[in-house]
Each structure stands twice: as structure tokens, then as C-alpha cells.
């Protein structure tokens, strides 16, 4: 077991897709994790299917590398602000951070969010400029941007004068200067060992361990992960579980199994001392933020307050005419059990029951909740969700809403369209700066102003724009924001879509379905080109008479249907619509399926206005 002065605990902070997980891969390879003949796995830290597909890290992962006689525990943090709950907890386990910045893009909003948390905790920072071998790298400008960011976030003198390493994660090289060419990652390892402090804590004192994350295993149940702040922990040791914010919580527990992180896996150990990051099992009701103490000295540790959720959706049992046909888990009990299981691992999530068949699920952003929905679909769940709603707060007697700092990198010819659209969505332009051949626009915009904007943004920038946002503050409500400039095409009757019916319907807008697709009355089958809903009969067949030959149907030319992803469906949803999620399909539908009732409700609403 490594002694305390030979341990370094670090977290890697980076924006989505700046190469964090790839760099960790190279550190593992050069740290000798893989045997000579062992097949290496690309992006080992992104172990979930969704993470590999989307190229993002959702849950923070722990791993360790051996360099000389040092053990470096590396914690990979999510770069997306929607998973900020993960980030804040993880920073409590480490003594320093590596700020990884793309040599072309520079620091981005999510980087700012996590770095601010790290600086507040007083962590030392190593700046790593990654992808220096890219043809569009702007190394010197990016270094200036990092210094400006550190100044902006009130970094201390020591944090401001952080060492900088220049690396290429893909090639596995690092150097001390921007013009030098490294051969391996030795400069990075040396900087970590010499600059980051070893963990402190009295190995001989009474035990204190703060649980920073929870893993779940079908065989051993909950696995608590955290750093030992003080003392030593042993297998079969009796402990007291307490909570800093809730003095009433005091339960007894026993350490059944104890592991340290070794390379990519967990290594079982009999004992571990202060400074080490460990995983332990045996306590069924352990949760994030609790402290494990020696029963003779119960002293809970303070816990990083996790930011509140900003958006909410209603998850409900699917009650459409196609309910139960494609899913394996379809009842409210299945839905409740699955959401409760997610709460075990995700502290940023809040779930409240809304009647018998519905649950309000609040999270840190659309992406946070869409990842959960996609995971549930893949596991065989069937459910419906409402349009996202922002969670407001009352501050000094005024109703306030979340405001996001949005940064967009766009081609020069798209600037006008983006600024105009953001103005309509109550966004305030903070500044524009040229970045290479493009412009970086920075806005403060209400969270609800960004609902449904990503698709429009990609259209306006012809797919070349990059946008990201992070929660900035709360401000008084900014008034009505128009969500959608188009209406829905709604199926008039249940049946199977036919070429003849679709051909007539496509004149009214763009369709989501092709011939042979089963539909039901009230299902949204396309986008109406006007700003109003329109009912169409896509099941209509051509009447066969002597005058109308069946063969002439072959001449009908149908445009290809639009296929929406889960995020695009959520962005398209109107307030009176639901998204039906099943393992095989995503269907948008009206809350009220009956056409006559919908029209009656619309008349009532107009009369009240």
C-alpha cells in the first residue's frame, strides 16, 4: 500500500470533447496498466454505451496510475454542466486539478463552471493545453484566454501562476514549452508529482471518510466511494454513519468489503489509511454526503452543497392506444422503482410523485434528463414525458427564473441570424470576439429561451456552429417567449399510413412517418408549415373504380420523412403535447387525443383571452 506522501489525488477538468478521456487513456498506457500483449480499449473512462456514442462522460470515474514509486489517483469529471452535481462532489476527493483546454477552441463555459468550484476549494491547478498538433491550434491566444479566465474567477496568486504543460492526448506526448516536441507524458507526470500536494490527514486518528459517490452492483448492493480524511479503515470494522446537515442521522454499519482503485479495476484490500480513495460495501442505506466515523468519535464532515435543479419534466405511464405493445416495463410501479434506483446514484436528480401514475423529475438541464430517458428506453421501459418546464424561485419577493451564459462559435455570415433569434428569446448580447475565421458570441439568456433552440441554431449556421451554455444566475422573469414558429400535423384517425394520404398531407408541411407506419388519432405525424395545428388523414386510401386504376399510385412521389432524435423531439414538443418513449419508437402526440374535445378546449381558451 502506498504511503501518504507517495499518493497524489487529481481530477481532470475539461469541456466536452476537449480530449480528456483520450489523455487519460494515454496516461494509463504509459503507466503500464496494459500488459504488453493486452488489447487496449479506446476511451476507457467512457464505459457506458451512451457515453461512448455521444463522446461525453456522464458519471465521474476513478482510476489510478503508477509513476515511479508514486500512485496517482485520477478522477475523470463530466465536462457537461448538466452533470454538475457529479463535479462538485468529486472535487472534494482531490488535492489538485488538471485544467485541460483545447488548443484551438480555448476555455468554454462548462470549463469555467467546474474550474470556479475547484478554485473555491483552494485546489492547485495544472494547465494542460491539449491538441497542440491540430492545424488550427492558437496556442498563445488560448494561454492568454486561460489567464483571463483565472483572473475573472478571482484565482489566488499561486493559482494564477500555475504551471502549463503542452500535450497531444492522441499521440501521448507532453512538453514544457509550446515549441518543444515531447516524446511521452513524462513532463505531465513530473509536474503532477512535484506540484500537487500529497493528501493530509492523521493516519493514527479516529476514522473519518466522506462518501462522494455511489456505485451500484446487483450482487453486493450499494458501493460507497470516498477519500479517507483521517484514520485507518479495515474490513469488518464497525462504523457510525452520520450527516453534517442532519444531526439526527446516526446509524451503525459494518465494512464487509474494501477496495482501492488499481488501474482500471478495483483491488480488494484488508486495510487503507488517510489520503487513499477507497470503495466499500456492506451498508444498504449509505448515501452521498454521509460520513463514516469511528463510533468513539462521531464527527461528520461538511458536504459540498449541490446546485438545485433548473428544469422539470413529468414522466408518466404511457396511456396511448399503442401502450404496452413495445415495452417490457410499463406500469407506474416499474417507473417508480427505476426512478428510485436512479436517485441512488444521481444526487442532482429530484423526483416527486404527481398522482398515482405520474412523477415530476427535476434535473440540471435537458441533456441530464434526456440521458436518463435514453437509458430507460434501452432497458425496456415505456413511458410518456411532458415538455420541459423551468423551475422558478422567489428572491426578495420577486419571481425569478434561471439565466444561462450561452457561448456560440459561428461563421461570420450566420452572426446576424443568431443575434436576431437570441433577441427574440430575451437573450442579451454580452460581447463578440473573432476566433480565427469565426466569431464567438456570448449571451445571457433565460433557460426557457434555449428550449428548442439547438435545432434552429444548427439550421441558421448550416451545421457549422458550436453552442454551449451553463447556469449563470437567477433574475426576474423576462416575460413571454415564443416557443415555436410552426404547428403540428395531427393524424385524424387510427390505422396504417398510406402513400395516397401521405402525398396529400406532405403539401401541408414536413412528415415524420413513411407508408406502412401505424398511427392513432391525435398522434403528431409532421410539422405544419403554418403557425397552427392542422388535422390530416394519412390513412386515406384512393377509392378504386373503373376510372381510377390502382397502378397510378406508383407515380406518387413522397419526400423522405424527418427522423428526430430524443433531444430534437423534446425541443419540438408544445405545451399541449407529450412524447411517447418506447424501446423501439419515439412518438409525439397531443395530450387530448380526441379532435372534437381539442377544438372545444381551444375555443374555451380563446374566449377567455
Locate each region found by the language model.
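A short, contiguous, amphipathic alpha-helix enriched in charged residues
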Residues: 320-343, 555, 559
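P-loop NTPase switch module centered on the Walker A-proximal segment
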Residues: 1-101, 105, 145, 214-217
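Residue-level signature of catalytic and energy-coupling elements of molecular machines
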Residues: 17, 23, 55, 74-76, ...
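Conserved structured catalytic cores and adjacent interaction surfaces
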Residues: 5-19, 81, 104-116, 122-124, ...
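Conserved nucleotide-binding/hydrolysis modules and their immediate coupling elements
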Residues: 208-313, 321-325, 486, 495-545, ...
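Canonical P-loop GTPase G-domain recognition
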Residues: 124, 134-194
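Interdomain boundary/hinge elements
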Residues: 39-42, 127, 153-165, 199-210, ...
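Long insertion/accessory domains within large nucleic-acid-processing enzymes
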Residues: 261, 266-269, 400, 445, ...
Amino acid at each position: 500500500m502506498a504511503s501518504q506522501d507517495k499518493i497524489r489525488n487529481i481530477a481532470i477538468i475539461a469541456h466536452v470533447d476537449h480530449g480528456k478521456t483520450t489523455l487519460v487513456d494515454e496516461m494509463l498506457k504509459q503507466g503500464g496498466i496494459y500488459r504488453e500483449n493486452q488489447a487496449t480499449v479506446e476511451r476507457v473512462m467512457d464505459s457506458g454505451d451512451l457515453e461512448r456514442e455521444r463522446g461525453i462522460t456522464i458519471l465521474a470515474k476513478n482510476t489510478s496510475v503508477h509513476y515511479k514509486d508514486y500512485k496517482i489517483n485520477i478522477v475523470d469529471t463530466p465536462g457537461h454542466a448538466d452533470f454538475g452535481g457529479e463535479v462538485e462532489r468529486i472535487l472534494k476527493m482531490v488535492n489538485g486539478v488538471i485544467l485541460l483546454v483545447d488548443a484551438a477552441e480555448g476555455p468554454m463555459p462548462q470549463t469555467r463552471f467546474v474550474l470556479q468550484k475547484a478554485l473555491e476549494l483552494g485546489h492547485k491547478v495544472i494547465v494542460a493545453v491539449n491538441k497542440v498538433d491540430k492545424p488550427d491550434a492558437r496556442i498563445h491566444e488560448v494561454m492568454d484566454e486561460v489567464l483571463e479566465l483565472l483572473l475573472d474567477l478571482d484565482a489566488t496568486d499561486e493559482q494564477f501562476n500555475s504551471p502549463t504543460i503542452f500535450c497531444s492526448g492522441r499521440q501521448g506526448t507532453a512538453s514544457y514549452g509550446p515549441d518543444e516536441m515531447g516524446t511521452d507524458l513524462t513532463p505531465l507526470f513530473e509536474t503532477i508529482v512535484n506540484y500537487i500536494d500529497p493528501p493530509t490527514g492523521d493516519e493514527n486518528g479516529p476514522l473519518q471518510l466522506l462518501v462522494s459517490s455511489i456505485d451500484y452492483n446487483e450482487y453486493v448492493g450499494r458501493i460507497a466511494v470516498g477519500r479517507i480524511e483521517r484514520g485507518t479503515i479495515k474490513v469488518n470494522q464497525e462504523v457510525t454513519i452520520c450527516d453534517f446537515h442532519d444531526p439526527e442521522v446516526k446509524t451503525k454499519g459494518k465494512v464487509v468489503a474494501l477496495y482501492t482503485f488499481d488501474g482500471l479495476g478495483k483491488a480488494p484490500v484488508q486495510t487503507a489509511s488517510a489520503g487513499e480513495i477507497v470503495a466499500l460495501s456492506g451498508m444498504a442505506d449509505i448515501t452521498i454526503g454521509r460520513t463514516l466515523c469511528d463510533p468513539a468519535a462521531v464527527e461528520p464532515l461538511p458536504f459540498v452543497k449541490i446546485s438545485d435543479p433548473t428544469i422539470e419534466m413529468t414522466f408518466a405511464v404511457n396511456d396511448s392506444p399503442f401502450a404496452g405493445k413495445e415495452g417490457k416495463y410499463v406500469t407506474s410501479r416499474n417507473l417508480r422503482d427505476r426512478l428510485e434506483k436512479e436517485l441512488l446514484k444521481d444526487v442532482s436528480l429530484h423526483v416527486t410523485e404527481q398522482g398515482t401514475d405520474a412523477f415530476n423529475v427535476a434535473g440540471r438541464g435537458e441533456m441530464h434528463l434526456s440521458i436518463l430517458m435514453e437509458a430507460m428506453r434501452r432497458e425496456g421501459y415505456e413511458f410518456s414525458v411532458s415538455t420541459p418546464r423551468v423551475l422558478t424561485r422567489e428572491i426578495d419577493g420577486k419571481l425569478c427564473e434561471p439565466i444561462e451564459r450561452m457561448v456560440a462559435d459561428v461563421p461570420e455570415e450566420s452572426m446576424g441570424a443568431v443575434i436576431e433569434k437570441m433577441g427574440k428569446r430575451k437573450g442579451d448580447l454580452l460581447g463578440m470576439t473573432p476566433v480565427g475565421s469565426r466569431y464567438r458570441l456570448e449571451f445571457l439568456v433565460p433557460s426557457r429561451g434555449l428550449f428548442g433552440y439547438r435545432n434552429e441554431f444548427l439550421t441558421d449556421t448550416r451545421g457549422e456552429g458550436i453552442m454551449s451554455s451553463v447556469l449563470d444566475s437567477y433574475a426576474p422573469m423576462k416575460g413571454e417567449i415564443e416557443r415555436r414558429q410552426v404547428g403540428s400535423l395531427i393524424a385524424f384517425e387510427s390505422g396504417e399510413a398510406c402513400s395516397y394520404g401521405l402525398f396529400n398531407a406532405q403539401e401541408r408541411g414536413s412528415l415524420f412517418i413513411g407508408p406502412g407506419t401505424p398511427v392513432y388519432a391525435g398522434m403528431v405525424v409532421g410539422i405544419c408549415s403554418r403557425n397552427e395545428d392542422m388535422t390530416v388523414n394519412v390513412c386515406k386510401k384512393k377509392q378504386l373504380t373503373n376510372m381510377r386504376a390502382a397502378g397510378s399510385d406508383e407515380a406518387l412521389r413522397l419526400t423522405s420523412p424527418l427522423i428526430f432524435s430524443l433531444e430534437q423531439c423534446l425541443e419540438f414538443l408544445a405545451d399541449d403535447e407529450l412524447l411517447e418513449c418506447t424501446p423501439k419508437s419515439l412518438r409525439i402526440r397531443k395530450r387530448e387525443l380526441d379532435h372534437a374535445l381539442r377544438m372545444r378546449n381551444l375555443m374555451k381558451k380563446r374566449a377567455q383571452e
